Curated annotation (Swiss-Prot):
It holds the Pfam family YceG. InterPro entries: MLTG-like. The keyword Signal applies. Keywords: Signal. Residues 1-33 form the signal peptide. This is Uncharacterized protein YqzC. It comes from Bacillus subtilis (strain 168). Gene3D superfamilies: Endolytic murein transglycosylase (3.30.1490.480).
Length: 154
């Protein structure tokens, strides 16, 4: 580029900056701000949305009861199978960086739980997935999901 070309380019930059600065400082802030829609969502709006999507809302207490009943039914199903078998004990070693899916897979492989996916879902749904600690734990095949999780979170 020639000296003239560079001067023209610099002049254009200065002019554009001046125009943007003038617009920024001279316009009304309310006019420049995006229109904020302060619409409050009512319970009726939520219910209409849930009905349109064919969904159901459940409060936390009922949800926890449903999780517990699911766990009990899973334990009853697996309990009838394991009553004939003897109780297995396994020393689980959880290392730093292991995910709940890794732990679930190990427990299923060792015969402590019947389904790694169900156990992993329970841990995440109950909110324990961030509380599982590294270390060595003794778990038994007759323990419920809740007891296993309490053992792993101590």
């Amino acid at each position: 580029m020639t000296k003239r070309g560079i001067q023209a380019f610099a002049g254009g930059i200065i002019l554009a900056t001046a125009v943007l600065a003038a617009v920024f400082y001279l316009t009304d802030e309310d006019q420049a701000a995006a229109v904020k829609d302060n619409k409050t969502v009512t319970e009726q709006d939520v219910n209409n949305y849930l009905d349109s999507k064919k969904l159901v809302s459940v409060n936390r207490d009922e949800y926890q009861k449903l999780l517990d009943s699911k766990e009990k039914s899973l334990n009853n199903d697996s309990g009838s199978d394991t009553k004939s078998d003897k109780v297995k004990t396994y020393k689980l070693t959880i290392k730093d960086g292991m995910s709940t899916a890794d732990v679930s897979a190990i427990l299923e492989k060792e015969g402590i739980i019947s389904s790694a996916q169900d156990f992993n879902d329970y841990v995440i749904d109950a909110g324990y997935h961030k509380e599982i600690r590294a270390g060595e734990f003794k778990v038994k095949s007759d323990m419920s999901f809740k007891k296993i999780v309490k053992t792993l979170t101590r």
